[in-house]
């Protein structure tokens, strides 16, 4: 019965953490929908701060790819530089300090590289992984979509920033609901995934067939 509950992917502020992956200056003009996915990741960061969800951020080889873009609003967030294609090695010690951790909420770039490898490493640790698909992207749409399918088949929960936010607060009677509602009322940008999720041959859909 416990295993069945775990597979539902429920999330709680006290047992979750937000990972923000490699949203850096030199990738601004290379990654599809970069401004849009950064804006959605910024929303997740605002929500995490309101709900006291821990946040960790990485920068991939910042000497070459530059710093995190300022519009993410991540000033003051613990930041680690890395060369690995996973966030887990540089954040290992931070994860070990959180024995209550069960769920990782994952945003950033690129989907087929650091998001995918981070997700797999976290699954190996026995953690649930929730990828905010509206806060992840790649330089190639094919790489992005195949990586999302690959992650779901491996046990990652694909969700949206809004869905994850509402899962965290669970009730309109939540004391921070009004503050969070202001964030949710902001316009949601187009990020190019709607047609993919509607496709009859979409591998993410359980009843899809060739």
Curated annotation (Swiss-Prot):
Task: Return the Gene3D superfamilies for the record.
Answer: Isochorismatase-like
**Gene Ontology biological process terms, A to Z:** protein destabilization
Which terms are listed as keywords in the entry?
Answer: Cytoplasm, Nucleus, Phosphoprotein
Location(s), subcellular: Cytoplasm; Nucleus
Record's Pfam families?
Isochorismatase
Statement: the UniProt record of this protein carries the keyword Translocase: no
List, alphabetically, the CDD domains matched. YcaC_related
What protein name does the entry list? Isochorismatase domain-containing protein 2
Q: Which domain of life is it from?
A: Eukaryota
Q: What Gene Ontology cellular component terms go with this record?
A: cytoplasm; nucleus
Family per UniProt?
Belongs to the isochorismatase family.
- What lineage is this protein's organism placed in? Eukaryota, Metazoa, Chordata, Craniata, Vertebrata
Which of the residues bear the PTM Phosphoserine?
7
Originating organism: Rattus norvegicus
Q: Whom does it interact with, and what assembly results?
A: Interacts with CDKN2A.
